[in-house]
Amino acid sequence: MDPDTEQMRVEKPNHEQPKPNTEFPDGGFKAWSVVVGAFCGLFVGVFQAYYEANQLQDLSPSTVSWIPAISMFIMFITGPFVGRAFDNYGPRYLLLAGTLLHVFGLMMASISSQYYQYILSQAICSPLGAAMVLYPSFSCVTTWFRQKRALALGITASGSSLGGTILPIVVNRLIPRIGFGWTMRACAFLLLGLLLVTNLTVRSRVAPQPKEAGIIAYLRPFTSLSFILTSLAGFFYSMGMFIPITFMVTYGEHVGLSNSMAGYLVSIFNASSGIGRILPGYIADKVGSFNVSIAAATLSTIFMLGLWLPGHSRESAIAFAALFGFSSGTYTAISPALIAHISDLEEIGTRSGTMYAFMSVAALTGSPIGGALISSAGGSYWKLQVFAGCMLGAGTVFYVLARLYITKGRLWEKV
């Protein structure tokens, strides 16, 4: 097939020909129950601040930051393989295996005491299980919605915001009372209950269609320029986004917040992120996902360079957590909708996973780079902030280029 013909086929999904049994319900009990189950599946939390202050206090923040960095890398790099398995076999076995691995990893973290043990449990095992839940959850929601797709995906993604809001508070409250081990076990049991709901409710509306195996299946998405530009945007934005998330707590302590209040910055960030995932999702269904993504990426860059960089106060740290949480939450929620817009439904798992694998390098290197920049600046955060701001700005530029390419340069168009 001619590459240009193939490109037009995948880049104009709004004009795809109807196929038998492929009408999108865009609502109803089954469709919204999938959203509820996917929401439960994305309920996760962040524990790095505790590692730095307690279990791994003898190690530098840069060294400890490899735990979330490797964790995100594993979740992203496995995307193409999990996505391909979803396209070929459906979500059922992936969700079951993911549940077992995710909970097992948290249980093993509860009895860990050495750095390598946290790497194995929290940076490899648990994220691998989480990936087997995350990609099928997003992909299944996509098969049930079209007109309300961005809203449905935003509600789904807000599950991680709620988890990120609640779990740090739970952890901070429980650790002094029952210790780190039982706190992690309590979180694992909580997630097990939620993941059972995910296993019972999340299903794809489209029957799996086994396709050819081999490296070509994973490289084909890169024959589309719109996919390449969108993936580059996600890569640079992710590089800029993960850094402030990783170092938000330590920065709060740096500007004078108490340990407990600095810990609540994560909850503030995630609560705001939840709003940023749902409200812009509703707007994106009206004006276009790419248009909303450009606006959100622009705001993120402004908040980074115009607020976090010049602000050196406790108030500015709190304000940044809230505002950046909102804008970055939009990115998290709308990214799957962007890929769905330029992809065939039957390949949504593979193409989504391939995009996230492209972002895995950013996930792996962003946090360690941030830690190294802090050390090179003598404990100051200004180099980290400038670097993150430049990455966010580059991501914004590539979102604009992707949008202009898709619309053939037309400015006032829903896309």
UniProtKB/Swiss-Prot annotation:
Its main location: membrane. GO terms for cellular component: membrane. Glycans are attached at N199. Keywords: Glycoprotein, Membrane, Transmembrane, Transmembrane helix, Transport. Residues 1-18 have a biased composition (Basic and acidic residues). It comes from the Eukaryota. The chain crosses the membrane at residues 27-47, 63-83, 93-113, 118-138, 151-171, 178-198, 227-247, 264-284, 290-310, 318-338, 354-374, 386-406. It is a multi-pass membrane protein. PROSITE patterns: MFS (PS50850). Residues 1-22 are annotated as: Disordered. Pfam families: MFS_1. It is found in: Membrane. PANTHER family: MAJOR FACILITATOR SUPERFAMILY (MFS) PROFILE DOMAIN-CONTAINING PROTEIN-RELATED, MONOCARBOXYLATE TRANSPORTER. Belongs to the major facilitator superfamily. Monocarboxylate porter (TC 2.A.1.13) family. Fusarium verticillioides possesses 2 unlinked loci, FDB1 and FDB2, necessary for detoxification of antimicrobial compounds produced by maize, including 2-benzoxazolinone (BOA). The FDB2 cluster arose as a duplication of the FDB1 cluster with rearrangement and expansion by incorporating additional genes. This is MFS-type transporter FVEG_12626. It comes from Gibberella moniliformis (strain M3125 / FGSC 7600).
